[in-house]
Amino acid sequence: MNYKTTERLEFHELLQYFENHLMQQIMPFWLENCLDHERGGFNNCVNDDGRLISTEKFLWSQGRALWMLSSLYNDFDGDPKWLELATPIARLLIDKGRTPNGDWFFSLNVDGSPKKASDRKSVV
């Protein structure tokens, strides 16, 4: 469904457009390329063809992925697969994401250990 930028759309048309884009493009890309089934969490440093360019796991991305999957379950279709996919991300955040004083780490290494700011390299 392609629209010209000058075309006026009804709300239900916009909603359908974005639902289709989410479910036919974004989620399949994420599910195929970004979930870390071995260690939990979400690989957010991938290029447009899905190639992993860094294994660093940024906590804000973990939270975003957790929210998206939970929201799909709670607000979209109630499919239990969304909770199954969200659970390892939640587990990573709960088990590895916090400092001893309760703050959140900025990012984690592939093994779940905290990434030191001095070890961070640009992925661009």
Please report, for each region that a protein language model flagged, where it lies by residue.
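Glycan-recognition and catalytic cores of secretory/periplasmic carbohydrate-active enzymes
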Residues: M1-V124
